[in-house]
Design a protein with these regions (language model features):
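Hydrophobic transmembrane architecture of multi-pass small-molecule transporters
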Residues: 2, 415-504, 510-513, 522-524
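Transmembrane core module of solute transporters
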Residues: 19-79, 83, 113-114, 174, ...
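Structural signature of transmembrane alpha-helices in multi-pass secondary transporters
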Residues: 35, 64-67, 71, 98, ...
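Small-residue (Gly/Pro/Ala) motifs that create kinks and tight helix-helix packing interfaces
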Residues: 46, 158-170, 334, 422-430
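Cytoplasmic loop-to-transmembrane helix junctions
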Residues: 59, 143-150, 315, 403-410, ...
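Helix-loop-helix hairpins in multi-pass membrane proteins, especially solute transporters
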Residues: 75-214
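Small-residue-rich alpha-helical segments with characteristic i,i+4
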Residues: 160-161, 373-457
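C-terminal membrane-cytosol helix-exit motif in multi-pass small-molecule transporters
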Residues: 184-202, 220-232, 250-264, 508-515
């Protein structure tokens, strides 16, 4: 076989069809949004699922984590399987498996069956998002900024809108409707993709020889163990529990083994060598910081509003809805703005906006109004939109076309790992940070502190108007202790938001490591 013929085999050939590329993009985005909503919508209906099956909250949490684990395990296989079957055909297979998984969730008679169904659904949903990214880059090869803006609609909007739609369906009908709506929409997606997306030929000559079962087992064990540690760590007091230490060690060893194996194996399940592209390596790392800022605040803001201000879960969900709207609007306009402004400058502006928003969140207190919470959230999500499009375009700018599927899978996997660790770390930071503040403040609740005596006496006189003196004294002391707990939590949130703001500022100089070839390409 000639060298030119071998090169042609490496490239995926696409059959040309006269279909509007914007219509094709919308068709590809629909199942991607469904896969992401399936992950975040169940967060809201978790208590309903626990009550329906008579399970505890920790047991019902496995409904969420089982889907995430299956997603994480399948992500690295995207590039290999896309080349083996062809992107379009593999995309259809993923949607079919995802749809069947949703149907199995409806048929579940107990919690264990539901968890198995969610694993099946997660296997289908795991590769949908990176495939969407790779296919959008194929549809718009000369408009990578616009392609990444469309991809951002699914990647950013769906997780933010998912809790709202999940809560709406659960409150008005039942938790089963979170899965019911997936089925007709998946069937519509399958039909539209079948007829509107051009078929690409699989590269079977290279990729049907051997399936890298050892590499797949390595990443499966690594991702599974990591998610178990992140999910159960807080419940079992993290590394004070021996089995948590063992599972963490297995996860780290499996990641290292996977990396070394994929570099040496002749037919790797995922091409680790794409990280040799400096733009992809640095761009993926910086994109992960955006995910940390977005998803950490997505966890912290509802937690702040519920634990410190007393909002209900539904009210906290409504606080998050404007974030989704701003993200959607920002991503749509940034696709065009990215053509006019240098990508690194635009990304830096986005991080400055995010840092300002996190600083505003750190200034919130227990008397904060709804508007004072919503406005920093809107600013944060606008900053995410500003930075997401150019940094995503820069990440894939210097990669050859036949590497986009591998790169998209690795890009999604890396961000998935960082996001999982950061959200778990944020939750632990609030719990442990509150304890540190409480230990420091409790020293001041002593009789030798004159301010303590003044406040205690004032509260006692207030309660003595309603209760006997002994009861009034206990209620006064209890009220002061509750205020101490409240201030301890507030201090932890203050520190968390400040650290996020600092992270957004520190990452800006690293943008200089990225190469921007936009001007040179236009000149040529």
């Amino acid at each position: 076989m000639k060298t030119s013929e071998i090169t042609e085999i490496e490239e995926t050939t696409v059959t040309k069809k006269q279909v509007n590329p914007y219509i094709q993009a919308m068709v590809i985005l629909l199942p991607s949004i469904l896969a992401l909503v399936a992950s975040s919508a169940t967060n809201v209906c978790q208590p309903n699922i626990a009550g329906y099956f008579g399970a505890t909250q920790y047991e019902a949490n496995s409904v969420i984590t089982s889907y995430i684990i299956a997603n994480g395990i399948m992500l690295p296989t995207t590039g290999y399987l896309a080349k083996l079957f062809g992107k379009k055909q593999f995309f259809l297979y993923c949607i079919i498996v995802f749809c069947i998984g949703a149907g199995l969730c409806l048929l579940a008679k107990d919690l264990h069956m539901l968890i198995m169904a969610r694993i099946f659904q997660g296997i289908g949903g795991g590769c949908i998002l990176p495939l969407c990214q790779a296919m959008l880059l194929d549809i718009f090869p000369n408009k990578k900024g616009f392609a990444m803006a469309l991809y951002g609609v699914a990647a950013m909007f769906a997780p933010l809108a998912g809790p709202f739609f999940g809560g709406y369906l659960t409150d008005n009908w039942s938790w089963q409707w979170v899965f019911i709506v997936n089925i007709p929409l998946c069937l519509i997606s399958i039909a539209l993709i079948k007829f509107l997306i051009p078929k690409d030929e699989p590269v079977k000559e290279k990729y049907n020889k051997k399936f890298d079962i050892i590499g797949f087992a390595g990443i499966a064990v690594a991702m599974g163990c990591m998610q178990i540690v992140l999910d159960k760590g807080e419940q079992f007091n993290w590394f004070d529990t021996p089995w948590i230490c063992w599972v963490t060690g297995i996860s780290i060893f499996s990641f290292i083994f996977f990396y070394v194996w994929e570099l040496e194996y002749k037919y790797p399940i995922i091409d680790i060598r794409v990280f040799k592209d400096k733009n992809f390596l640095y761009g993926t790392s910086i994109s992960s910081i955006i995910n940390i800022l977005l998803y950490s605040t997505l966890l912290l803001v509802p937690l702040f509003s519920q634990s410190l201000i007393g909002y209900s879960p539904s009210a906290s969900g409504l606080l998050m809805l404007p974030r989704a709207m701003v993200c959607l609007f920002g991503l749509l306009i940034m696709g065009e703005i990215a053509k006019l402004v240098e990508n690194r400058l635009l990304t830096a502006i986005g991080f400055i906006i995010m840092a300002a928003a996190c600083f505003m969140l750190s200034c919130l207190n227990t008397t904060a109004s709804m508007h004072s919470i919503i406005i920093p959230n809107l600013i944060l999500c606008f900053g995410v939109s500003v930075a997401f499009v150019p940094i995503s375009a820069l990440s894939f700018l210097t990669l050859p076309a036949n590497k986009t599927a591998d790169a998209a899978g690795l890009h999604a996997l890396f961000k998935n790992i960082v996001t999982a660790i950061s959200t778990s770390a944020a939750s632990t930071f609030i719990a442990r940070g509150g304890q540190v503040y409480q230990n420091n403040l409790v020293e001041h609740l002593a009789w030798h502190n004159p301010m303590y005596r003044v406040h205690l006496n004032a509260l006692q006189h207030k309660f003595m108007m309603m209760y006997p003196s002994v009861v009034a004294q206990k209620k006064a002391a209890g009220t002061l202790y509750k205020q101490l707990i409240l201030q301890s939590k507030l201090g932890a949130f203050y520190d968390a938001f400040l650290w996020l703001a600092l992270m957004a500022i520190v990452v800006i100089p690293f943008l200089l490591l990225l190469k921007n070839k936009t001007k040179r390409i236009k000149a040529n």
